[in-house]
Structures are given as structure tokens and as C-alpha cells.
Regions:
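N-terminal Rossmann-like NAD(P) cofactor-binding subdomain of oxidoreductases
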Residues: 1-120
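Single conserved hydrophobic/aromatic residue that forms the stacking wall/gate
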Residues: 119-128
Length: 128
């Protein structure tokens, strides 16, 4: 069943998954958490809040219990998740001290307005 989030009673949801952009999380996730729903947020909105754990279950499951501070769990960026899952066993064996990473993200990830500007950066004399 699909329901309008504006009318949704989060007290009826054990877990609420947010992945509709930071503005939606900003507006509705705190309400869901206050109503007793455990919020798992896949946007960037809560990633840097000290009281909200940033969780990759395969990497730091011991941090999950800290969601009780705000009833919210944040996820890292998708590139970060894949990387840390792969690096965790190496780190456990060899204690990685530093890593430099470059990622290349899709323009569409920043929204439809950014996509309209791709013609400014793409080569015009060859196929893409």
C-alpha cells in the first residue's frame, strides 16, 4: 500500500527507510524517530551528526546500538560502503593507517538541474 508521507502515522512502522533525498529526511525522519520508528537514512542529511551512528553492518556492527541516541541510523555514500566492506578484512590483518580515494559520481546524483549542464563539460566533437 502506498500512502502520502504527509498523512503517514510513523508509530505504526517498526522501521522507516529514507532514501528520497536530504530534504525529505530533514523534514520527516525526526518525526518518524520521535514516533518510535527506527529510521535508517540513506541520504547525506544525518551523516555528520555526532549522535547518529554511521553504519555499515559488515564493518562496524558494534555501533548499531548507538542509534538509540536519536532513533536514527545513517548510511555512508554508496561508493564508501563498497570500499569499506572490501577494506575491512585487510585492515583487520594489516591495520591500514591511511588511504587516498577518488570516486567519480554520476551527474544525475546531484539532481535534474545538473544533468542539463552536462553539455558544457562533455566533448562535442566525439561520441560519448
Amino acid at each position: 500500500m502506498v500512502q502520502d508521507i504527509n498523512d503517514f502515522d510513523f508509530s505504526n512502522a517498526d522501521i522507516s527507510l529514507f532514501s528520497a533525498g536530504s530534504e525529505v529526511s530533514k523534514k520527516f525522519a525526526p518525526t518518524a524517530a520521535e514516533k518510535g520508528s527506527i529510521v535508517i537514512d540513506n541520504t547525506s542529511y544525518f551523516r555528520y551528526e555526532d549522535e547518529i551512528p554511521l553504519i555499515v553492518p559488515e564493518v562496524n556492527p558494534e555501533e548499531i546500538e548507538n542509534f538509540k541516541n536519536k532513533n536514527i541510523i545513517a548510511n555512508p555514500n554508496c561508493s564508501t560502503i563498497q570500499m569499506v566492506v572490501a577494506l575491512k578484512p585487510i585492515h583487520d590483518l594489516y591495520s591500514i593507517q591511511k588511504i587516498n580515494v577518488s570516486t567519480y559520481q554520476a551527474v544525475s546524483g546531484t539532481g535534474v538541474n545538473a544533468v542539463s549542464y552536462t553539455h558544457l563539460t562533455l566533448p562535442t566533437n566525439r561520441e560519448v
